[in-house]
């Protein structure tokens, strides 16, 4: 549905050339939700704007719905863009128009008959859950409601693809969840292909089928979400995943923790579980097998792409090599073990 081949984008700043995107290739299958994640300045927005040619790549091919947009004439590109919807972090609604008027605008520009416009807008209002806001103005809407209007407007011409440029960044967590659920519902109901960019791994975790990680204008990792969460291949991907699961060491432990082992101290471990290691009773197995005691201080488990992953802070007590054997046992069963200190 969306195929990018060797996309490069160079911006000229005086005599200086800035490589915003370097040799990026990716494929978004039809009907999937594909996330692109990266830090600020990584090139995410430039990439998504290349998909509908708001930014023209310096080189490379952009195929959407089987068409190479980079070789289309201006008139053909305008027609192709009607099948590509887009929403932004800022809603860009017309304050002088009602909700109905904002959604109807793309249809009016296409000279669609009024009766058809009314029918289509009513369908979209029901789809996004705003049937009671037909005559409301943007000033009287919440942030989440404004984004729902923007989504409805983006769907007015029945696009095959929806591009989401940091669409939830300006929203509070509860509203973000509701907008993500709406996008997932639209994807399921309409078979819509969605490409979204974000700097939040929680967004990817909640709705994406596949994810690509971008850094410094380069695509450094891409795979199905469950694989990236289970086996991240780059430090940047690992950092994004850890941002979704973060456990703080209790203050009293921070104050008494030592950096080196001693006869009267026990190791404080951070254990990271992914995939099968989450479901296996590894802790109870280790306690029985190596005759150790484990004091679990805190833990958290979450899901992404149908795969569970989790993190745990635990204090480990044992004798006669039990601690070392336990750590090796856990590592052999694909648990990442980090000794944070000794308490």
Curated annotation (Swiss-Prot):
Subunit-level organization: The complex is composed of two ATP-binding proteins (MetN), two transmembrane proteins (MetI) and a solute-binding protein (MetQ).
Catalysed reactions, semicolon-separated: L-methionine(out) + ATP + H2O = L-methionine(in) + ADP + phosphate + H(+); D-methionine(out) + ATP + H2O = D-methionine(in) + ADP + phosphate + H(+)
Domain ABC transporter: 2-241
Keyword vocabulary terms for this entry: Amino-acid transport, ATP-binding, Cell inner membrane, Cell membrane, Membrane, Nucleotide-binding, Translocase, Transport
Subcellular location: Cell inner membrane
NCBIfam families assigned: ABC_MetN (TIGR02314)
PANTHER family, per database record: AMINO ACID IMPORT ATP-BINDING PROTEIN, METHIONINE IMPORT ATP-BINDING PROTEIN METN
A cellular component annotation (GO) from this entry: plasma membrane
Function: Part of the ABC transporter complex MetNIQ involved in methionine import. Responsible for energy coupling to the transport system.
Protein known as: Methionine import ATP-binding protein MetN
Record: residues binding ATP: 38-45
EC number: 7.4.2.11
Keyword Membrane in record: yes
Main location: membrane
């Amino acid at each position: 549905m969306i195929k990018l081949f060797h996309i490069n984008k160079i911006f000229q700043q005086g005599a200086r050339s800035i490589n915003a995107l370097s040799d990026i290739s990716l494929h978004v299958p039809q009907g999937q939700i594909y996330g692109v994640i990266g830090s600020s300045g990584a090139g995410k927005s430039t990439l998504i704007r290349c998909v509908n040619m708001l930014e023209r790549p310096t080189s490379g091919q952009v195929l959407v719905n089987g068409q190479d947009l980079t070789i289309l004439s201006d008139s053909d590109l305008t027609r192709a863009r009607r099948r590509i919807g887009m929403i932004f972090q800022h809603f860009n609604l017309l304050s002088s128009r009602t909700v109905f008027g904002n959604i109807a605008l793309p249809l009016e520009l296409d000279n669609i008959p009024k009766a058809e416009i009314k029918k289509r807008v009513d369908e979209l209002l029901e789809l996004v859950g705003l049937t009671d806001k037909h005559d409301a103005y943007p000033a009287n809407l919440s942030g989440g409601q404004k984004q729902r209007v923007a989504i409805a407007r983006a769907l007015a011409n029945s696009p095959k693809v929806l591009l989401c440029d940091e669409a939830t960044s300006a929203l509070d967590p509860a509203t973000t969840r509701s907008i993500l659920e709406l996008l997932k519902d639209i994807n399921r109901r309409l078979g819509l292909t969605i490409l979204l960019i974000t700097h939040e791994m929680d967004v990817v975790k909640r709705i994406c089928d596949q994810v690509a990680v971008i850094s410094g204008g380069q695509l450094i990792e891409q795979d199905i979400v469950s694989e990236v969460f289970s086996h991240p291949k780059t430090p940047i991907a690992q950092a994004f995943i850890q941002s979704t699961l973060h456990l703080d060491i209790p203050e009293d432990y921070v104050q008494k923790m030592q950096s080196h082992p001693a006869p009267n101290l026990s190791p404080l471990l951070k254990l990271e579980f992914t995939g099968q290691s989450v479901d296996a009773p590894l802790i109870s197995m280790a306690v029985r097998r190596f005759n150790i005691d484990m004091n679990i201080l805190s833990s958290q488990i979450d899901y992404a792409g149908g795969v569970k992953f989790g993190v745990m802070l635990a204090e480990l007590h044992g004798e006669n090599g039990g601690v070392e054997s336990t750590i090796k046992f856990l590592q052999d069963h694909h648990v990442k073990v980090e000794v944070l200190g000794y308490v």
